[in-house]
């Protein structure tokens, strides 16, 4: 029997409905702690500049990571909560690039020439809204201002609907060696419900071309909890994705927040799976991927055992940041583009979220930093706890006490009390360590 056609009823997925009801609450994915809603406008461009310069001082050469936000999409996906601009006017993309070049011109001199870029990610939006010539021009502009590592990890998000497979070789020539493909779900009913019609053939053709071009890692994004999704249809999607054998698979939870994200108002509440079905969808995915040999990295990520994320996890070097899971824990992150988030030393910063204010700041020769945060000692301590739990699924109380000079049980007295019910529910194990 074709493994992609196994009936979900045959899969031992059991759900404690009472536990779901008690634990069903919204919460952050913790790509950062504190989360972005804690950022304040008092952290401005000058604060950012002073921290960037301060990080150059001393004998330690800290590596750099770069995130570039390319916000344009030609069509809207109803589930999307990203900062995006939906347009078919390509001239808007060219204008954006010219302003992005100006930001790069201002950011580059803030960092010492010997600080090498070891990691870079381009996200959106849809980066391939831009032509290959425009993307190549952006690459060249970056290289004029930043020293790129020869063996760095350079990734780009792709919409298989907006790129010809032959262009994968062009992207590889620019220096990209990792690619992330948005799939979400192959089921036709689900695709119509979220306004993202994307054939399996399109996706597989891009994946095959990426392998042929020499990309070292291919990631596929899926979403569970979308309208019209059910166990049978999602099981088929999982089977097809597993057969394509990407190196990494991210399975994100759909958060339905129509009051915050206007496109989500096009999704009917009645078509969304219930919380218990959502959990079964996640359980189904975890089981299918485990059976296929993938390693659970954490939160929403799975990877093949020989992938760098799985290797880093085994050696205790895994890290989580605004770009998701990463093997580069010690990099200062530079965010470029509208709404982009950076992390320099013990600070976070975010650029203006709207094109008009982003452009206005650059027209005034100012870095387009809108807000940010300097982390307190408490923030740093709690971030370390969350990092350990997110990346290693465990926490050494003693290591926290040594690193932060606290009595763990006293410092987290309230939290330890809250954990008691989770222990009784079998969700958490506690010991003296």
Label each residue range with its predicted role.
Residues 57, 63, 86-110, 115-409:
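C-terminal scaffold of the Radical SAM
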Residues 407-424:
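Short amphipathic alpha-helical interaction segments
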Residues 423-433:
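A short, conserved structural fragment
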Residues 68-84:
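Local cysteine-cluster metal-coordination motifs and their immediate loop/turn environment
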Residues 1-65:
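Flexible, acidic/Gly-rich N-terminal and inter-domain linker regions that tether
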């Amino acid at each position: 029997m074709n493994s992609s056609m196994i009936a979900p009823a045959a899969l031992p997925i059991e759900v404690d409905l009472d536990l779901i009801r008690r634990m069903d609450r919204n919460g952050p994915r913790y790509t950062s702690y504190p989360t972005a809603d804690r950022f304040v406008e008092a952290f401005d461009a000058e604060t950012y500049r002073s921290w960037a310069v301060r990080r150059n001082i001393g004998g330690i050469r800290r590596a750099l990571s770069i995130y570039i936000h390319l916000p344009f999409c030609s069509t809207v996906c109803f589930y999307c909560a990203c900062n995006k601009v939906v347009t078919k006017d390509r001239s808007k993309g060219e204008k954006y690039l010219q302003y992005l070049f100006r930001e790069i011109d201002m950011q580059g001199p803030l960092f010492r020439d010997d600080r090498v870029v070891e990691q870079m990610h381009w996200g959106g939006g849809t980066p391939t809204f831009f032509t290959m010539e425009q993307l190549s021009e952006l690459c060249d502009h970056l290289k004029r201002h930043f020293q790129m590592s020869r063996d760095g990890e350079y990734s780009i998000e792709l919409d298989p609907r907006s790129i010809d497979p032959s262009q994968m070789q062009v992207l590889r020539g620019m220096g990209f060696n990792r690619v992330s493909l948005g799939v979400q779900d192959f089921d036709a009913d689900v695709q119509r419900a979220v306004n993202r019609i994307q054939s399996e053939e399109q996706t597989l053709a891009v994946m095959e071309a990426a392998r042929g071009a020499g990309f070292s890692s291919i990631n596929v994004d899926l979403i569970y909890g979308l309208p019209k999704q059910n166990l049978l249809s999602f099981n088929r999607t999982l089977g097809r994705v597993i057969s394509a054998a990407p190196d990494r698979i991210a399975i994100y939870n759909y958060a339905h927040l129509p009051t915050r994200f206007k496109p989500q108002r096009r999704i009917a509440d009645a078509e969304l799976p219930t919380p218990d079905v959502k959990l079964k969808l996640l359980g189904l995915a975890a089981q299918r991927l485990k059976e296929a040999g993938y390693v659970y990295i954490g939160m929403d990520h799975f990877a093949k055992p020989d992938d760098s994320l799985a290797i880093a996890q085994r050696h205790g070097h895994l890290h989580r940041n605004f770009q998701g899971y990463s093997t580069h824990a010690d990099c200062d992150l530079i965010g470029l583009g509208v709404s982009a988030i950076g992390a320099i030393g013990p600070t976070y910063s975010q650029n203006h979220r709207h094109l008009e204010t982003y452009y206005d700041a650059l027209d005034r020769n100012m870095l387009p930093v809108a807000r940010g945060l300097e982390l307190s000692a408490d923030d740093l301590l709690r971030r370390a706890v969350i990092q350990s739990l997110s990346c290693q699924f465990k926490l050494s109380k003693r290591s926290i006490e040594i690193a932060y000079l606290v009595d763990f049980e006293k410092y987290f007295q309230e939290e330890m009390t809250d954990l008691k019910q989770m222990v009784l529910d079998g969700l958490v194990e506690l010991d003296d360590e």
